[in-house]
């Protein structure tokens, strides 16, 4: 009887110990080297609130990488004609840099290259000032935009083979990297529907994958000369038909074979918003570092995070560094996002799922399991 009581007591103590023990956390640098956040750069008017957001929201959650979609929201000195009407000054940017440095956050500026040179009926700064760079100048800009349309117009592209385009673009790439004191640059390059069009006098009829790879490589080599990395979105490198992923998060226009033509030190930002697709394994096996990028579905974001950690842990040691981390994406302006974030606004059009909800959910889980 005495022996039975001792055994029972030991079981009770063990049970209580298991219930009260803290979850053994692992170093975040080991679990997820990149813990990112991607958002549009603020306007000058909202700079102070954005700095507060960095200090009070990003830093405590252990975000260590901030990709800022700057585009033409900067007072470029090298190409002043490409400035937006309301753009950040050098002094404004230095405040962002200081806030990031104080919180050990790596800041990476983004300017969309190749695609996304228009939006709906609005032509972007580059093609507005340099219409000769347009890949499809014969496509009329609609007064009232709708999708789908007969021209397959989503966003315009510049022609990567125009002899003057890089002499305009590379000075602003260098300038924005310099002012942000950045060792990397995000070139976008997602959702490129117009490329190698038959009517283009320079690239018509050419292999679209080779054109895409050529532009990636040209940008990469320019950055490498200054010891900077190139980051891009990964959708054009996935076969949308074979995978069933479609024309947005993958390619329908045969650019996917460029994955075997571009430098292996390009960092791939792999975005999938409705499913936890296993494409990080594809990119890692091709030799790239890959970052998974969710948007507005918290459960998908957490599933993707768990996949990334599992891939990293269970792969051969040569593969482990390729699984680089996670980056929450925001596709509204920073002002709209911060309003929605602080007021916890709901999105009735997406079953209540929001980008601020995904950000909270993802980083709550990241900080639960790591330190």
Residue ranges and their predicted role:
Residues 9, 42, 71, 273, ...:
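Flexible loop residues that form catalytic
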Residues 1-26:
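Bacterial Sec-dependent N-terminal signal peptides
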Residues 22-56, 60-61, 65, 136-139, ...:
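N-terminal hydrophobic targeting/anchoring segments and the immediately downstream early-domain regions
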Residues 99-121, 140-172, 268-288, 325-371:
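Electropositive, surface-exposed helix/loop patches at the edges of structured domains
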Residues 3, 16, 36, 198-201:
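Secreted/extracellular small peptides and ectodomain modules produced from precursors
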Residues 179, 201-359:
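Catalytic-core regions of glycoside hydrolase
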Residues 38-252, 258-260, 266:
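Aromatic-lined carbohydrate-binding surfaces of glycoside hydrolases
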Residues 19, 87, 95, 285-287:
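Extracellular/periplasmic carbohydrate-active domains that bind, remodel
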